[in-house]
């Protein structure tokens, strides 16, 4: 942010300009005001990712060890597929054993930026050493935060829950008071110790660490709704206001900020919720987890979430977490991650088409090829060429050199309109 304010372009900024529909002046202005943030893998600076208004929307894919399953082989299979099928950012949400070993290997394996939630490491260590995930010391919070940045994390996430927010949650009529894992861990710690959130108490130190390492900070909403009944309620808005105040402090220290919020939400509330979050947090890049548009989509959560994501992105969100069909049930397998990413790529492209001038060029090209029945070009221009070609082999026309697909056959509109008069 400091470089952008001085009008200088970094190597990462130059690479962003090569891949995004934005000019140098707009990029520098966006970064200097906090409306655009750049994430980089500190071990591989060749693939920086820009988040913010005027840029293409991005997909974040969660990964990491779990207390239920810590198979490195399966986790790295998911990482490989995530990178292959369109994820722009990985988020290490490790809460199982060997997280340090896993993160080191992850950082050297992928070229994607890696976000994290350091609090999960504190909880796992407390559980392993003390038999209680809440039994950690406030000084451990800052130590782990700094440790993960030094290891190469691109953007650490913190939960800004406070004593006042906890009171508001517990006096509210929420159907599901707590659903954020990190928010709940920190809330339980605050209630047990009667101390304020160490992230808030040490916020200036947190910002100094981020500024020194040129790493943006992510706020992970502690009060996000876990059901439609609680979506976009006063509790959540109170947290957004707090985040807005903290964003101002961060920007004064030249620290870029991202906010990750909005869970379950009815379709009619998504536009106003995104607008509210953007306004309260000074138009910084925002991400959404879904939003899930129904609480009843068990087994098909990727569909529910991708519908919500399309609406949220079109209305101003900048990235979304890829939720799989296994959400709310269990850990995804690689095939679930691939399925989700394919759906999100289509959804986000559709939303970006309506927001960013010039992106429709490839859609126009495939339409021209379709009109001419140029099958090879159509298949190559598809968002997922491999799937398009596999589908063509399975159900496409027997004689592709003849016009028409296998749906209309000889009644193909493109064929009929070109038929010479003498045929009749």
Stretches with model-predicted labels:
Residues 2-300, 305-319, 393-395, 399, ...:
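Alpha/beta enzyme core
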Residues 17, 44, 326, 419-420:
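Residue-level detector of alpha-helical segments with a strong bias toward transmembrane helices
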Residues 296-299, 304-305, 312-357:
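C-terminal catalytic subdomain
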Residues 168-193, 225-231, 255, 331-424:
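Catalytic or ion-coupling anion/metal-binding cores of large enzyme and transporter domains
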């Amino acid at each position: 942010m400091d470089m952008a304010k001085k009008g200088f372009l970094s190597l990462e900024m130059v690479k962003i300009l090569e891949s995004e529909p934005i000019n140098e002046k707009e990029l520098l202005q966006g970064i200097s005001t906090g409306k655009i943030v750049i994430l980089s893998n500190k071990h591989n600076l060749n693939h920086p990712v820009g988040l913010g208004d005027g840029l293409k929307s991005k997909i974040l894919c969660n990964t990491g060890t779990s207390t239920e399953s810590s198979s490195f082989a399966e986790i790295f299979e998911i990482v490989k597929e995530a990178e292959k099928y369109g994820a722009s950012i990985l988020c290490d949400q490790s809460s199982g054993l060997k997280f340090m070993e896993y993160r080191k290997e992850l950082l050297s394996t992928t070229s994607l930026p890696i976000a994290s939630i350091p609090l999960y490491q504190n909880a796992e260590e407390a559980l392993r050493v003390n038999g209680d995930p809440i039994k950690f010391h406030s000084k451990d919070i800052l130590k782990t935060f700094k440790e993960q940045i030094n290891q190469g994390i691109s953007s650490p996430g913190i939960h800004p829950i406070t004593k006042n927010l906890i009171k508001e949650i517990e006096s509210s009529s929420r159907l599901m008071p707590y659903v954020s894992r990190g928010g709940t861990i920190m809330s339980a710690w605050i209630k047990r110790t009667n101390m304020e959130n160490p992230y808030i108490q040490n916020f200036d130190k947190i910002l100094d660490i981020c500024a020194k390492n040129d790493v943006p900070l992510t706020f992970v909403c502690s009060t996000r709704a876990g059901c439609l009944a609680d979506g976009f309620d006063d509790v959540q808005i109170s947290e957004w206001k707090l985040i807005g105040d903290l964003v101002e402090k961060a920007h004064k220290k030249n620290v870029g900020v991202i906010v990750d919020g909005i869970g379950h939400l009815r379709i009619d509330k998504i536009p106003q919720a995104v607008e509210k979050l953007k306004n309260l947090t000074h138009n910084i890049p925002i991400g959404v987890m879904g939003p899930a548009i129904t609480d009843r989509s068990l087994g098909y959560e990727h569909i529910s979430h991708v519908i919500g994501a399309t609406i949220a992105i079109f209305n101003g969100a900048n990235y979304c977490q890829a939720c799989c069909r296994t959400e709310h049930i269990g850990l995804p397998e690689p095939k679930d991650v691939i399925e989700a990413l394919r759906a999100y790529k289509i959804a986000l492209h559709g939303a970006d088409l309506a927001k960013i001038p010039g992106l429709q060029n490839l859609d126009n090209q495939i339409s021209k090829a379709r009109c001419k029945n140029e099958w090879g070009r159509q298949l190559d221009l598809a968002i997922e060429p491999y799937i398009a070609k596999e589908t063509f082999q399975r159900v496409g026309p027997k004689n592709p050199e003849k016009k028409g697909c296998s749906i209309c056959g000889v009644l193909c509109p493109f064929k009929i309109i070109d038929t010479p008069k003498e045929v009749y």
